[in-house]
Amino acid sequence: MAAGDTKVTIANNALTLLGANTITSFTDGSKAAGIANNMYDFVKKHTLSMYPWKFALKKQELQKDTATPVNEWDNQFTLPSDAVSTLPVAVFFSGQSNAPKELNFEIYENKLVTNSTEVYIDYVYDVAEGNMPTYFVTLLVYQLAWHLAEPITDQTTKSDYWK
């Protein structure tokens, strides 16, 4: 794992790829810090949501809400707040190992609705930077360089290069 990585070091690596000055914090008052602060969490969550990364998977039993859905389903469950996407990787109606994946559910906003009274999901969560493997940190740096390129350098060619 990339234990020494922080949001600022990852942003600085992306800024360095662009030939820009590095920052001391996201609030240091520089143009680069402001742009990186605005873009960082969006780019990180988008990159995490691109694939069901094994290092970012969680399994969780969802708690049934007391409210009843206003549609044809009998039950609703709130999705985890640390999920990077409202689309779970897998949904199960049993906590047993080798339980089959289920398709009889729908997602509305941050709710999973179904007729089942038990729901277990696999989902991608918002991993702390220090728990990301080096290969993912490298990908995140490249993704951030792509998204920061035009607002930092005013050059679309740099954005296209890192795309």
Language model: regions and residue ranges:
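Acidic, aromatic-lined catalytic clefts of primarily extracellular/periplasmic carbohydrate-active enzymes
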Residues: 41-44, 49-117, 121
